[in-house]
């Protein structure tokens, strides 16, 4: 009902709509219409009202509501089922539950705020209300489980290409899937697979993008290591950023389903800020220092250490050393 009231106001943008007309069209009382108007105002919609003239929509908040996204999203699959919440503990937890209940491929779970967002290596992810894109995507690919880890590289490629379209051409990928701008982290990606040794049941891809956060709003421990689109002087509505990202993710994913991961891995190499750099890798049980030379066909990082041997890194935390 609230969406219907909002749509009435949108259709008459710049003009007034009477409460009586809306109540008759929606088959509810004028008091009910007023309550919906009040609720919309509380969500940030600027609606003015005058006796005998009705209501007029002046400005909409930058919310990721289903109605806002439905108007602009041009994907075929991603986001066709769109689960939206004001707040949740974690979109990955919500998406995992939906996937276990049989939610279709392309289901998007998005929230305005996460209470317990998670990144790689079980780290927390700062997810304040209305400041970023905090969402998870359900995938049901038909490739073998051994290929699943490369989905995280695929996502990093898609998001980086989307940022370039927004004008943020300095965005690049630190292995495996952190997206950095001048050394500061813009995006976190967490991919979780469920299935057997032979078959993938589903993949839940959790993504956090800092969009509107300002430097002074960051927690003290993030001030020197995090960034946002706003901090990089990219002025974009969250809905538009989300549209570009979902469309790029869908395009990249179906390219992989059609043709495999080879081209995506080549694109990853081109967008990497890791390859060719001196790095330190903290891998399970070992720490290595050397030069990142390439990724292999499985997306693992190849590092040439001081004695000339090549170490293959399957999992670990990479730090890029400043150039001398």
Task: Annotate the PLM regions.
Residues 2-164:
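N-terminal lobe of the biotin/lipoate ligase/transferase fold
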């Amino acid at each position: 009902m609230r969406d219907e009231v909002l749509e009435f106001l949108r259709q008459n943008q710049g003009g007034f709509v009477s409460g009586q007309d809306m109540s008759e069209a929606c088959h509810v009382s004028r008091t009910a219409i007023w309550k919906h108007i009040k609720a919309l105002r509380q969500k940030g919609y600027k609606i003015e009202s005058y006796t005998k003239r009705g209501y007029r929509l002046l400005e909409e908040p930058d919310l990721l509501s289903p109605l806002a996204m439905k108007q602009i999203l041009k994907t075929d699959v991603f986001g066709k089922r769109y689960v939206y919440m004001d707040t949740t503990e974690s979109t990955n937890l919500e998406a995992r539950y939906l996937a276990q209940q049989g939610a279709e491929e392309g289901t998007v779970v998005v929230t305005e705020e996460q209470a317990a967002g998670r990144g790689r290596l079980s780290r927390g992810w700062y997810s304040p209300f209305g400041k970023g894109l905090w969402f998870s995507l359900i995938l049901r690919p038909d490739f073998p489980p051994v290929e699943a880890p490369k989905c995280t590289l695929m996502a990093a490629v898609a998001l980086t290409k989307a940022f370039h379209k927004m004008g943020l051409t300095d965005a690049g990928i630190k292995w495996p899937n952190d997206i950095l701008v001048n050394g500061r982290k813009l995006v976190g990606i967490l991919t979780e697979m469920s299935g057997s040794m032979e078959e993938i049941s589903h993949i839940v891809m959790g993504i956090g993008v800092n969009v509107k956060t300002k430097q002074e709003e960051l927690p003290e421990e993030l001030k020197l290591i995090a960034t946002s689109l706003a901090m990089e002087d990219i002025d974009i509505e969250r809905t538009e950023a989300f549209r570009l990202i979902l469309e790029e993710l869908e395009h990249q994913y179906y390219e992989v389903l059609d043709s495999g991961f080879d081209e995506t891995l080549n694109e990853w190499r081109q967008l990497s800020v890791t390859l060719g750099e001196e790095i330190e890798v903290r891998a399970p049980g070992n720490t290595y220092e050397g030069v990142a030379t390439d990724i292999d066909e499985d997306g693992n990082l190849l590092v040439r250490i001081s004695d000339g041997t090549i170490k293959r890194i399957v999992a670990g935390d990479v730090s890029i050393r400043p150039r001398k």
